[in-house]
């Protein structure tokens, strides 16, 4: 559950939850329940959370906070944590850990590299500022802790313990010094990793999925941002904030819209109901992402991504196979995962039998090839936050100034640091700014990748299914603002996609085109409009005048922050 601020493009559609005043329930209900009433709600999430704040200049966290959480809420959280039974030697007192430096930040808080004094080892600690958090977010964090605590597999992130420190919730997890695979690719393999590395990573990922699915769990947000790499080459799947249970032998058991658009399966968008097959689809998209360095549709706004999912062909690596970038076996693996009909997709166990995995290597191959020459994730994070990095011309630079380095003497040195001089790295392309690639064509928008930082959906403009997104220079870092509804424009070709397999219907109309258009408009009214719709006429200030108890909000996760040691969620549920 580590946070790994990543940003290329992709955006989260995350579940709306009923607002709660206290977290004093014994068994947290799954966020998919009561979907009909949830469809009437719009989630009022704060855009970016703590991720908007620059890393502090203090050597340690503040000992006091201006606003104190109520005793009732504190006791409620303590009761929740006490119900999470762990078999762990990790201490549950803050004075037994030394925070070294931040390695990521997200909606719920910052993630620090820390040193466990009694055990003499490095860990990752997520620090959640409870006084700044809506109770729903705290509920989500505790839900994720429960899921992680139930995981017992080498390819799933390990949770150790959690406790309250003043008004902060500390979550202790594995420290994986390589950081997220998405971050590694941005720094070292921006155009994709070699097939043998991809196959090695994917095999470990499938083993983790096989375990999850055998325990009736769906991850629902599988992508390279949530794949963490250890200094020893260990590969672990993280970020269980939007995972869900499914009923065994049930074909369609979930209907919540949740995930990151570029990785979402068609059945999620069409609300037909789904099961673990959505993870297999996301796995196939991730397989493409590893070869190309980016997922299909990465440069499209969500509305166009959804259009392609509904009416376009499944993505394929045919071009890469023709060019010799990947083998026929690798392409075949992707094709099997990206069947539009969920029942035609193999399960994780069946996929592990695919011949392509015969070329998978051991973890030491990951160390010698994927991690070789890379500085540890905290160094890359610091570089991306440094003034030199932010001053480097970059189409998506939007990071605050550099924080001071958190130091402590008793630090377990990373093997990645040996004989490596930190180079002057350009800011990661995963920076979180929405930029129009072509000012003359504002409809062409480069979307950042999801990193579990929610923004208000009313700030998104959907005009005829293809309205642009924009970032206001007048707003705090990471905030989107609603731009004026543009006049209806048509490009000369009438294209609504790009050259990478997206649909581009001509301006001329036909019964088939009109049928699709009518269907999508109907679908958008009932689904997509809830995620991206603008406020009703005469209600332009609606989003700014909701009462505290107003339940109307969707949760749509966008990848605003640069995930370095991830887990935070970019997801959508409605």
Curated annotation (Swiss-Prot):
Cofactor(s) it depends on: Mn(2+)
Basic residues composition bias: residue spans: 478-491
Binding site for ATP: 103-111, 126
Biased composition (Basic and acidic residues): 24-41, 536-553
Active site positions, chain numbering: 221
Example GO BP: protein export from nucleus
Keywords attached to this entry: ATP-binding, Kinase, Manganese, Metal-binding, Nucleotide-binding, Phosphoprotein, Serine/threonine-protein kinase, Transferase
PANTHER family: SERINE/THREONINE-PROTEIN KINASE FRAY2, SERINE_THREONINE-PROTEIN KINASE FRAY1
UniProt name for this protein: Serine/threonine-protein kinase fray1
Catalysed reactions, semicolon-separated: L-seryl-[protein] + ATP = O-phospho-L-seryl-[protein] + ADP + H(+); L-threonyl-[protein] + ATP = O-phospho-L-threonyl-[protein] + ADP + H(+)
Xref: CDD domains: STKc_OSR1_SPAK
Modified residues annotated as Phosphothreonine in this record: 256
Spans annotated as Disordered: 24-64, 381-447, 462-514, 532-554
A Pfam family assignment: Pkinase
InterPro entries reported in the protein's UniProt record: Kinase-like_dom_sf, Prot_kinase_dom, STRAD_A/B-like
EC number annotated for this UniProt entry: 2.7.11.1
Listed GO MF terms: ATP binding; metal ion binding; protein serine kinase activity; protein serine/threonine kinase activator activity; protein serine/threonine kinase activity
A GO cellular-component term linked to this record: serine/threonine protein kinase complex
Domain of life: Eukaryota
Compositionally biased intervals (Low complexity): 386-403, 418-441, 462-475, 492-506
Listed SMART domains: S_TKc (SM00220)
Keyword S-adenosyl-L-methionine: no
Post-translational modification: Undergoes autophosphorylation in the catalytic domain.
């Amino acid at each position: 559950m580590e946070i790994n601020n990543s940003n290329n493009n992709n955006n989260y559609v995350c579940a709306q939850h009923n607002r709660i005043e206290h977290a004093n329930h014994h068994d947290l209900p799954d966020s998919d329940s009561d979907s009909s009433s949830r469809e009437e709600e719009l989630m009022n999430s704060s855009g970016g959370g703590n991720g908007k704040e620059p890393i502090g200049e203090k050597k340690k966290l503040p000992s006091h906070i201006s606003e104190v959480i109520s005793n009732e809420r504190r006791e409620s959280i303590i009761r929740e944590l006490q119900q999470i039974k762990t078999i762990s030697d990790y201490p549950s007192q803050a004075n037994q850990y030394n925070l070294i430096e931040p390695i990521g930040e997200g909606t719920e808080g910052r993630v620090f590299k820390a040193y466990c004094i009694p055990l003499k080892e490095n860990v990752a600690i997520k620090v959640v500022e409870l006084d700044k958090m809506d109770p729903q977010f705290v509920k989500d964090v505790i839900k994720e802790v429960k899921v992680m605590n139930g995981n017992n597999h080498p390819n799933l992130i390990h949770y150790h313990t959690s406790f309250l420190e003043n008004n902060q919730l500390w979550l202790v997890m594995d420290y994986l010094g390589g950081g997220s695979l998405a971050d590694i690719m941005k720094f070292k393999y921006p155009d994709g990793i070699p097939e043998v590395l991809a196959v090695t990573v994917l095999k470990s990922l499938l083993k983790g999925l096989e375990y999850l699915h055998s325990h009736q769990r769906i991850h629902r947000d599988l992508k390279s941002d949530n794949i963490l790499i250890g200094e020893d080459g260990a590969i672990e799947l993280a970020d269980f904030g939007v995972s869900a249970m499914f009923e065994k032998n049930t074909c369609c058991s979930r209907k919540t819209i949740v995930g990151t658009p570029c990785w979402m399966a068609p059945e999620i968008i069409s609300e037909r109901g789904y099961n673990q097959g959505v993870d297999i689809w996301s796995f196939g998209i991730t397989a493409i992402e590893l070869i190309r360095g980016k997922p299909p549709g990465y440069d499209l706004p969500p509305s166009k991504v959804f259009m392609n999912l509904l009416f376009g062909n499944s993505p394929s690596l045919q071009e890469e196979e023709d060019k010799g970038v990947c083998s026929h076996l690798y392409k075949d693996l992707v094709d099997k995962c990206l069947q539009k009909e969920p029942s035609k997709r193999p399960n994780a166990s069946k996929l592990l039998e695919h011949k392509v995995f015969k070329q998978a290597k051991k973890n030491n191959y990951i160390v010698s090839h994927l991690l070789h020459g890379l500085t540890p994730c905290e160094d890359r994070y610091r570089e991306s936050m440094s003034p030199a990095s932010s001053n480097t011309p970059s189409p998506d630079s939007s990071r605050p100034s550099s924080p001071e380095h958190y130091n402590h003497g008793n630090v377990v040195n990373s093997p990645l640091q040996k004989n490596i001089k930190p180079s002057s790295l350009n800011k990661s392309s995963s920076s979180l700014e929405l930029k129009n690639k072509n000012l003359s064509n504002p409809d062409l928008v480069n979307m950042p990748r999801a990193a579990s930082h929610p923004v208000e959906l009313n700030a998104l403009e959907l005009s005829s299914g293809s309205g642009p997104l924009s970032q206001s220079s007048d707003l705090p870092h990471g905030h989107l603002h609603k731009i004026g509804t543009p006049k209806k424009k048509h490009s000369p070709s009438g294209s609504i996609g790009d050259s990478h397999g997206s649909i581009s219907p001509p301006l001329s109309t036909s019964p088939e085109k009109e049928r699709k258009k009518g269907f999508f408009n109907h679908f958008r009214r009932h689904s997509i409009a809830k995620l991206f719709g603008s406020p009703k006429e005469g209600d332009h200030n609606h989003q700014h005048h909701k009462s505290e108890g107003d339940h109307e909000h969707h949760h749509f996760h966008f990848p605003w922050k640069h995930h370095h040691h991830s887990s935070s969620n970019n997801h959508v549920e409605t």
